[in-house]
Amino acid sequence: MVAERSPARSPGSWLFPGLWLLVLSGPGGLLRAQEQPSCRRAFDLYFVLDKSGSVANNWIEIYNFVQQLAERFVSPEMRLSFIVFSSQATIILPLTGDRGKISKGLEDLKRVSPVGETYIHEGLKLANEQIQKAGGLKTSSIIIALTDGKLDGLVPSYAEKEAKISRSLGASVYCVGVLDFEQAQLERIADSKEQVFPVKGGFQALKGIINSILAQSCTEILELQPSSVCVGEEFQIVLSGRGFMLGSRNGSVLCTYTVNETYTTSVKPVSVQLNSMLCPAPILNKAGETLDVSVSFNGGKSVISGSLIVTATECSNGIAAIIVILVLLLLLGIGLMWWFWPLCCKVVIKDPPPPPAPAPKEEEEEPLPTKKWPTVDASYYGGRGVGGIKRMEVRWGDKGSTEEGARLEKAKNAVVKIPEETEEPIRPRPPRPKPTHQPPQTKWYTPIKGRLDALWALLRRQYDRVSLMRPQEGDEVCIWECIEKELTA
C-alpha cells in the first residue's frame, strides 16, 4: 500500500521527525550534518537496489550508502521508498513521509539477505507503479538504481523500456554501477551519461559519490525576482537556486506560469546557468493579479515550485513627477532672477546726498593751574626805599623775574623760600566687582545653533546689500536708455 502525502503540519511538529536521520547516524551526526551539503527540495525518492548473490558480502556497504544519502535530503515533505531486486523485486518500504516508518524501513533494509539474479527492470517496474499511485505528473520523483554487474539477455532492453515509462511519468533516473558493470547499458537506462555514477573502487567507495549524486539530483529554486511588477509592463523573471543545468542539455527546461490560478502557460528560458535562470514572463493587466512561477526540467512532465508568486501593482508612469520637478525648477529660476535683476539690469539714479553737517566746535581746554614758583625776599638786596627797609618780594617765573629783581644783586644773606608741595596720597583702585550672572550652560545643539545663526546673518547681510540697490519711490530708473548710451559711447 502506498501512503499519500501527509497534510501540512505546524513548524514545531517537524522538530522530532527532522532529527531522525541525525539520531540514526550516531553521536557525530549533528556535526556532520552541519559540515556536509544537503538538499531542501521536496520530492519522492525511490532507491532501487541490487540484492543479487554477487553483493552478498557487501550488503552492509549498500545499506550505509542508502542511509548516508538519505540523510542529505532534509525536507520535511520528502517521501522515501526502498525497493530491492534479484530474480524478483520486493518493496521493503512503500513510499511514505512518515519518519517512524522510514526508520523501520531502514532496519528492514539492513536485514535483507542478497540472493538471486540481476533483474533490474523488475525493480523499476515497482517504482513506476508507486509513481502512478502517488499522482504521476503531479509529483517530482527521482529513481536511484544501483547494480554491480553486467545485465544479461533481454534485461537491458526491458530496463530501458521501464526507464522510458519512468521519464514519461516525470521521474528522473540515475544509475550507480559498482565493479563489473557495463557503462553503456547504464547510460541507456539513465536520463543521460552525466547521470551515471561509476564506482570502480568497490562497494567501500560508494560514500565517495554521495556529494556528486546530491549535486546532480537536487534542483532547488531559492529566490525569485521581481516579486511585484507594474500593471501592463513587460518584464522578465530571474530565478536563483542550484542544479539548473539538469535539463538544459536536451532543451527540456520550461518556465511555467499560472495566472490567477485560472490558466497555465509555458515558455522556454532566455538563458540557463548552473545557479540562475532568466525567463520571459506574461504581462499582467490588472492590479492584484498573481503569477505563480514553476520550472520543469523534463519538458513539462513535472514541475518544481516553491511559493514563487509575482503580484501586479499600480505604478505611476513618472510624468507627474517630471512635471513637479520642472515647476520647482521654474520657480527657482524666477526667484533667482528677482534676486539678481537689480544687479545686472537696473541703473538706479538717486538724488545727491545732502551736504555734510558742520564739524562740532572743539571746546577750549581749561588752562592748567599756575605753578608755584619760588619767591625771593628782596629786602636783603636793599631795594624799596631808603636803606632798603621796606620789604619787597620778587616772584620768579619761566621768563625771569620782575624788572626790580633783575637790577638786584643777591646779598650774602639772601633767603630763598620754596613753598612745600603737599603730596596727595595715592588712592588704591577699587576691586573689580564679581560677575553676578552665571555663564550659560552649553547644550548639545549649541554648536549647530551657532553655525545656523551665522549662516542666517550672512544671508540677511547679502539680502540687505541687494535691497539697498533696489529703486525706491521717487527714483528715476533707466534700463534700455542707459544701455543704449553706453553702446553709443
UniProtKB/Swiss-Prot annotation:
Disulfide bonds join C39-C218. GO terms for molecular function: metal ion binding; transmembrane signaling receptor activity. Expressed in prostate, thymus, ovary, testis, pancreas, colon, heart, kidney, lung, liver, peripheral blood leukocytes, placenta, skeletal muscle, small intestine and spleen. Changing L45P: In HFS; infantile form. Residues 34-318 are extracellular. Pfam families: Ant_C, Anth_Ig, VWA. CDD domains: vWA_ATR (cd01474). A divalent metal cation binds at S52, S54, T118. The keyword Signal applies. This is Anthrax toxin receptor 2. It comes from Homo sapiens. The lineage of its organism: Eukaryota, Metazoa, Chordata, Craniata, Vertebrata.
